Amino acid sequence: MKILLSGFCLLSFLSLSAQDSLTILFAGDAMMHQKQLDNTRRGDFFDLGSYFANIEREVKSADIAVVNFEVPLGGEPYSGYPAFSAPEDFALALQKAGFDFFLLANNHCLDRRTRGFVRTIQALDSLGIRHTGTFLDCDHRHRTYPMLLRKKDFRIIMLNYTYGTNGLKVDIPRIINYIDKEIMKGDIAEAKLFNPDFIIANMHWGLEYERIPSREQRELADWLLRQGVDLVIGSHPHVVQPMELRRGKEGVTDRLVVYSLGNFISNMSREHTDGGVMVKVVLGRKGLRRYIVSAQYSLIYSSRYKNEQGKEDIRVVPAASWLGKNQNSSFSVDSALIKY
């Protein structure tokens, strides 16, 4: 798996107490293709126990773990690309692995039309999984967006937008957060009223399979930062794109742009789509200062193997372990964390 990344620095400015720092982990596109459905089905449930076992410790080490949930929970018949519908077992497996915040604004959220759209929101609510990006109606959006997360006395705003929904239109009164500068500008202004420590914009954007961000991505990232966003985290291209740390006032590094995290888990086999990165960011505060204490990424890979039924199965592993040909051993993701 060949991945090219721009320089990504580990930063540390001030000593912090535990309550003065917050760790957030971001993972890319979580998808369930037809082969995954066929090979993990066990009667009326899906056995996904091996999917995330090798990276679970790393995910759970974060205070907040975020994933781009790029499949609707549309009910049966379950299906893969091009019109996804995944079982609740997929969401449960991610939750068990430590992911507690799902992003829903993506180009597949209408794959099962209005019924699947509504069912996804209701299913995640019933599982106790927080999410944003799609809404049942205006009242639902007004009550829950901008999404404010409170953790360790930090106040984090989570925003989420998509470039489109594969030509499908959402039925009134349902709402999807599309990329629209006027709407986003209003959302960011409203977010500031919460007096957040950090504002994070999760963007489903860019061109599939392109390993360099487009001009539109770069311009939009710059625009978001100018509006007051602190972290811009991208998804959709299914491949990893460069990451940038930005310095703000007084030379303090307080902003981060990740153009694309790549795939977290899928059955895609096109070059560079069989893996991605998990990005872990430690956010800090000291008095009135808000800044990035450290930023690091872990390369991950969707490793294929034969399960107990003799069918091809998938598990997410640290790329360093995979490259070391230790696929059948217990992995420590710490060995794959790359710090500069």
Indicate residue ranges for each PLM-predicted region:
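Acidic, metal/ion-coordinating pockets
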Residues: Q19-Y340
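Bacterial Sec-dependent N-terminal signal peptides
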Residues: M1-Q19
